[in-house]
Amino acid sequence: MIGIDIIKISRMGALLERFGSKAMGRFLSKDEIELVKNHKTASGFWAAKEACSKALGVGIGAECGFHDITIFKSSNGAPNIRLSQKIVKEFNVKSISLSITHDGEYAIAVVTIESTAANKI
């Protein structure tokens, strides 16, 4: 399955300026917050988590929350994605890939998920 999301970076900027790190804690773990350098990075992480939930076919909600999805960086700085064991098991996730890009005022993310005879997908 494939999921895609786009967010206007200034929208994330306004959210973070208004609510600060408290807002980031709603959708990012402490480790993820440490990776966020600016509004652009936060926007990419938001888009990645939204795209992942869409690839699972459920969106962000009761079945898959923001904290079930973790964004981390590889040794060469590329973004990677990891799912909680609950999500891996429930959706029979075999593999997952992430791409994040920024263009002008937008952050865009695409997530692909391969699963075995999934319950949900």
Curated annotation (Swiss-Prot):
It is found in: Cytoplasm. NCBIfam families: acpS (TIGR00516), pantethn_trn (TIGR00556). SUPFAM superfamilies: 4'-phosphopantetheinyl transferase (SSF56214). The keyword RNA-binding does not apply. Mg(2+) binds at residues 5, 50. Its main location: cytoplasm. The gene is acpS. Its EC number is 2.7.8.7. One of its GO terms (cellular component) is cytoplasm. It comes from Sulfurimonas denitrificans (strain ATCC 33889 / DSM 1251). Belongs to the P-Pant transferase superfamily. AcpS family. One of its GO terms (molecular function) is holo-[acyl-carrier-protein] synthase activity. It comes from the Bacteria. It catalyses: apo-[ACP] + CoA = holo-[ACP] + adenosine 3',5'-bisphosphate + H(+). HAMAP family: AcpS (MF_00101). This is Holo-[acyl-carrier-protein] synthase. Its cofactor is Mg(2+). Transfers the 4'-phosphopantetheine moiety from coenzyme A to a Ser of acyl-carrier-protein. GO terms for biological process: fatty acid biosynthetic process. InterPro entries: 4-PPantetheinyl_Trfase_dom, 4-PPantetheinyl_Trfase_dom_sf, ACPS, Ppantetheine-prot_Trfase_dom.
